Curated annotation (Swiss-Prot):
InterPro entries: Ribosomal_Su5_D2-typ_SF, Ribosomal_uS9, Ribosomal_uS9_bac/plastid, Ribosomal_uS9_CS, Ribsml_uS5_D2-typ_fold_subgr. It comes from the Bacteria. PROSITE patterns: RIBOSOMAL_S9. HAMAP family: Ribosomal_uS9_B. This is Small ribosomal subunit protein uS9. Keywords: Ribonucleoprotein, Ribosomal protein. It comes from Geobacillus kaustophilus (strain HTA426). GO terms for molecular function: RNA binding; structural constituent of ribosome. Belongs to the universal ribosomal protein uS9 family. Pfam families: Ribosomal_S9. One of its GO terms (biological process) is translation. One of its GO terms (cellular component) is cytosolic small ribosomal subunit.
Length: 130
């Protein structure tokens, strides 16, 4: 018999994470590597686990993630978003908890483009009166 799987796609900055939740013992596998091997900082790992902690499902699902694009912080945010969306498929009752924590909202903040005539997105060249 086929195993039950729940899917969710998360995005943050330029990262996209495709997340699968499978009943298991709480392992988190990112791009075929353990999360502790893949993500360098403990703070980002805790951020990824946040939806599971809030819904009290931390030890009951294995999380299989395929993530592309961006850096570690963007990828961690995308994984968190994907896990939150997948948990909605597990139980729609989780929506209120996840929504209140802001985990279902796509964080739309991205780097502003550099404009010509300026040194950065907004930083202007030094002004000289004389």
């Amino acid at each position: 018999m086929a195993q039950v799987q729940y899917y969710g796609t998360g995005r943050r900055k330029s990262s996209v994470a495709r997340v699968r939740l499978v009943p298991g013992d709480g392992r988190i596998i990112v791009n075929k590597r353990d999360i502790r091997e893949y993500i360098p900082t403990e703070a980002l790992i805790e951020m990824v686990k946040q939806p599971l902690v809030l819904t009290e499902t931390l030890g009951s699902y294995d999380v299989l993630v395929n993530v592309q694009g961006g850096g570690f912080a963007g990828q961690a945010g995308a994984i968190r978003h994907g896990i939150a969306r997948a948990l909605l498929e597990v139980d729609p009752e989780f929506r209120t908890v996840l929504k209140r924590a802001g985990l279902l909202t796509r964080d739309a903040r991205v780097k502003e483009r550099k404009k010509y005539g300026l040194k950065g997105a907004r930083r202007a060249p030094q002004f000289s009166k004389r």
